[in-house]
């Protein structure tokens, strides 16, 4: 007898089984008519019971087929129609009970071959059918007896199976072999499963996989929706960030232009504190673009000291000396290696000049000494001229305290003078003249230099007369509050005058409007009168014409009569 080949089901996956239960199970049941797939992962004793049940089910199927054939119905089945009824036993998981299991398996295969041969024939005699069915039933009973023997043997084999259950590596190999068998048989039994599904209206495992596919598709659709939402949000963020970047680029361009304008009058000194004359050839075209522009990269990190054209700075010489002694600073020594690196922002001309300066120290020293001496000479001249202008000449008109005294080097800023203070200043100046000390008593918030400079300014503008100083004048009891009240009164008077003027203007406008109305009425009356006269004249002319016509008619009548 030929042994039936095992065909694994294409609708179930090996990965769905648990490893431990799969290793302990020795029998599979693929019967689609009885939904026993959930019981495939039980112990050996339960699987043997399932085999008994399956054999009984096969007997019931055969009896049903015989009943259908006795009614005159003949069914033709293919050899592959009963592959879903095969029973598989793993001989590798049994120790000493392999012989009994193989006998049961061969007996079952014989029975299934007989079923296939019976179903492929058209029976005309019911008696021969019943005989063959009885033989098959007897064989199934033998199978049941053998299975009971297997139950006894399985209890002995459980001890041997403990080693296989503990070896996880062997189990994983067996599962991989089953997967390979599944992949090899998948294509071969694809059409076979379709035919069986058409006959038996589908199995539970097929429906189970279709549900899983639908759930998987729904999950994918949900993930697509979520990803689309996230993409939209990210796209909106990108747009907003792009607008912010554009705004910042415009601001950077503005700041860059401001810095360029501010750095036009700048001297940059080398590491040794010497000015670089070629850096004055500053060109905007040599600068970086807005993207590569960094405010603190060109000047701050390069440790180049800045000095503006401001000779009024008191600490100029100190800073210059400190720059010459820059090697003593810790920051300089730490950043010496960084300073030796060629900066990309400095032009190639400056790099060449620096190299020439290092090679020709003697010629450069002479040039630098001359330049430094010229700067010192200019600074001295400027300071002397400034000190001489700040010195005050002694005169008999000045007070004793201020005679021959050098004023402080005070740089007056822009002081704010209100209208009230200016009017008070005018009155005080007209009373005291150029006695600045007396004038300052009325302005405690202002300094003496501010008072004098403001008075001289007003004299230049011709808002004040150039009055001389009044000696020992009487004091004025005028304050800002008095002037504020005077100004308020003046403002009130001006407002009253403006109101009166507005009232007069309104009265004039009303009179003009009344005159216009009267003139319009007169013109309307005249026009009406003229129209009436015109109408009367037209009526008179019409009457005259009618009279003339009547006369003409009468004359014509007389003429006609005469002719007759």
Swiss-Prot record:
* Listed name of the protein: Myb-like protein F
Disordered: where is this region?
22-107, 122-203, 310-410, 519-564
Q: Per the record's keyword annotation, is Nucleus included, yes or no?
A: yes
What SMART domains has UniProt attached to this entry? SANT
Sorted UniProt keywords: Nucleus
CDD domains this protein is in? Answer: SANT
The subcellular location is: Nucleus
Q: Where is the composition biased (Basic and acidic residues)?
A: 82-96, 365-409
Molecular-function GO term, any one? DNA binding
Name the SUPFAM superfamilies on file: Homeodomain-like
Q: Which InterPro entries match?
A: Homeodomain-like_sf, Mediator/Homeobox_domain, Myb_dom, SANT/Myb, SANT_dom
Q: Specify the domain of life of the species encoding this protein.
A: Eukaryota
Q: Where is the composition biased (Low complexity)?
A: 23-79, 97-107, 135-173, 193-203, 310-364, 519-556
Q: Give the matching Pfam families.
A: Myb_DNA-binding
Q: Where is the SANT domain?
A: 412-464
PROSITE patterns in alphabetical order: SANT
Any GO BP: positive regulation of transcription by RNA polymerase II
Please give an example of a GO cellular component term from this record.
mediator complex
Organism, by scientific name, is: Dictyostelium discoideum
